[in-house]
Structures are given as structure tokens and as C-alpha cells.
């Protein structure tokens, strides 16, 4: 399976990027993993949050393919425990999903067109996180899920 994390705008906080790099490297042991960054929009002055979401949506949708299984990281999505999330990944693999794409939107979230294209929504917490921090939290949880699936000692119950 190929897993891609599609994010809007680069991670500009160095310690967050370092953490992402650590877990992305570890993930390569288990799965083909790629982090794809959609460059930040230019000239957003005066644009409403809805206009920004629509512009970002066009960029997100352009990078998705028909065979992709699209999962939004969204505050209104289904919450999983770490073990539950590993089970979710196992179900995707058992179903023969080849390309699993997780999407982190910009600061204002997603436009309706992105919601319409998605197959699932997952929430990392009922709390709201900075969209850059979500990247690190998610990549770590992805790594944790694969260690659970491989019965490795990283995760403690």
C-alpha cells in the first residue's frame, strides 16, 4: 500500500518538521509513505475564509486521482484509539486499497468540494490543533499503528 499525507502549505516550524522527518523515515520500513506539500496560496489579503478554502480545494483536488482512497483529517471525523486506528489501516489493506491519501487542510479547514470527494474523515481529538502540529501528531500515530500491526514494542497498552 502507498500512503500519502497531503498538506496545505509547508511546515515552517523547524522542530515540528524535524519530528515529521523522524517518523516519516521510520514509516518507510513498513509502507511506501510520501508527504506532499501544496504550496501556500499567494495574495490572500482581503480574501474571506470561504474564498481561501475554495482556492485550496482546487489545489487539493488537482492532486487526487480516481483510485485514491481519500481520508480527511477533520475535527468532525471519527475518533479512534491508536489500536482502533491500526485496525482501520488493516481494513484498508485487506480491502485492497493501493493508494491511501490523508489530507490536512489549511487553517480554515476544507471546502464542501473536498468533503464531497472524501471517503472518510478522521479526527485526532476533540481538541483543536494547529494544522502544522496535526502533521506531526498524525505521522507519529501512523508509525504507531504499523508497530501495533507488526506486534512491535513501541506502543504500550
PLM region spans:
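N-terminal beta1-alpha1 ligand-phosphate binding loop
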Residues: 1-27
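Loop/turn-to-beta-strand initiation segments
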Residues: 2, 98-102
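Proline/glycine-rich low-complexity loops and linkers
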Residues: 105-106, 117
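Short glycine-rich anion-binding loops that position phosphate/pyrophosphate groups of nucleotides
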Residues: 11, 75-78, 106-108
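Conserved RecA-like P-loop NTPase ATPase core
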Residues: 5, 71, 105, 138
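Structured adenosyl-cofactor binding patch, chiefly the S-adenosyl-L-methionine
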Residues: 112-156
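General small-molecule cofactor/ligand-binding pocket signal
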Residues: 6, 34-36
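S-adenosyl-L-methionine/SAH cofactor-binding core of RNA-modifying enzymes
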Residues: 32, 39-98
Amino acid at each position: 500500500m502507498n500512503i500519502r499525507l497531503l498538506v496545505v502549505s509547508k511546515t515552517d516550524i523547524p522542530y515540528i518538521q524535524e519530528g515529521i522527518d523522524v517518523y516519516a523515515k521510520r514509516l518507510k520500513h513498513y509502507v511506501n509513505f510520501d508527504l506532499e506539500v501544496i504550496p501556500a496560496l499567494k495574495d490572500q489579503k482581503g480574501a474571506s475564509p470561504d474564498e481561501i478554502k475554495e482556492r485550496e480545494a482546487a489545489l487539493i483536488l488537482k492532486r487526487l486521482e480516481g483510485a485514491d482512497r481519500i481520508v480527511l483529517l477533520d475535527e468532525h471525523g471519527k475518533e479512534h484509539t491508536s489500536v482502533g486506528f491500526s485496525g482501520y489501516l488493516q481494513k484498508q489493506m485487506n480491502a485492497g486499497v493501493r493508494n491511501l491519501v490523508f489530507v490536512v487542510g489549511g487553517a480554515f479547514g476544507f471546502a464542501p468540494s473536498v468533503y464531497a470527494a472524501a471517503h472518510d474523515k478522521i479526527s485526532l481529538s476533540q481538541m483543536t490543533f494547529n494544522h502544522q502540529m496535526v502533521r506531526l501528531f498524525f505521522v507519529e500515530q501512523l508509525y504507531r499503528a504499523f508497530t501495533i500491526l507488526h506486534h512491535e514494542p513501541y506502543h504500550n497498552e
